[in-house]
């Protein structure tokens, strides 16, 4: 394990920066484009949240170092400081390396404007569904690894092994597992024939209700959170095409991740299925899409 870990850390050291893809000052994440061993790599650097269990608030003079005054006005004083850092207890940066990175990864993590699209059933069948088929199989091997316990097995929070109505809940790697207001989990279904909400039909209501009920029961047992502090939703378009449900703390600030035009509440999906027994393949769905997305041009052309 140590040798494997050292080899992965070495990859980070071999990253050769070429350009900045995105600088998000709100989320404090910068996305860098570069190469590792002549293959495209993306490196996401994120400022970590303060761990109030580690910082000794009664010893701030030790925590805040090299402090300088920026400005003061009446009762207000602004300072800049470096802070004491320790990788085990007080890391300051979380890094995510994607290597080798595909063109899909590059497009996804690039800075881009978004547009609203109303996708009709015809547009879905002619444009979106064929695209989704290209994003299955090897493109989501990492999902298969989780479902078969080949990877991240020690991170599983909840599991129901039933092949039809079962799922696995794991923490999203964006969450530090310490800041409860930033709680971020993901329920991945065992069923392999549901790529997105477009594949959902009336018969899938027991699956969705099972996710909702077990999450609301089990997650509060493991984390300091009440069930009415959890919000569950799906994305359309999703970031990968194997049905999964996002589970976040209600106070979580997620940018556009849980915003109108991207997220659909799980309870709303269940209600829509009750009212549309034939499924969600035959309804209009309006969502936002980035201009770098492979589907942007064909969908907007049909929407014109």
Curated annotation (Swiss-Prot):
Please report, in chain numbering, the residue ranges of the motif Histidine triad motif.
242-246
Q: Supply the InterPro entries for this chain.
A: DcpS/DCS2, HIT-like_sf, Scavenger_mRNA_decap_enz_N
Q: Does the keyword Nucleus apply?
A: yes
E.C. numbers:
3.6.1.59
The organism sits in which domain of life?
Answer: Eukaryota
- Where is the protein found, in the record's own terms? Cytoplasm; Nucleus
A GO biological process of this protein is: deadenylation-dependent decapping of nuclear-transcribed mRNA
Question: So what family is this one in?
Answer: Belongs to the HIT family.
Query: What protein name does the entry list?
Result: m7GpppX diphosphatase
Per the UniProt entry, what species is this protein from, by scientific name? Schizosaccharomyces pombe (strain 972 / ATCC 24843) (Fission yeast)
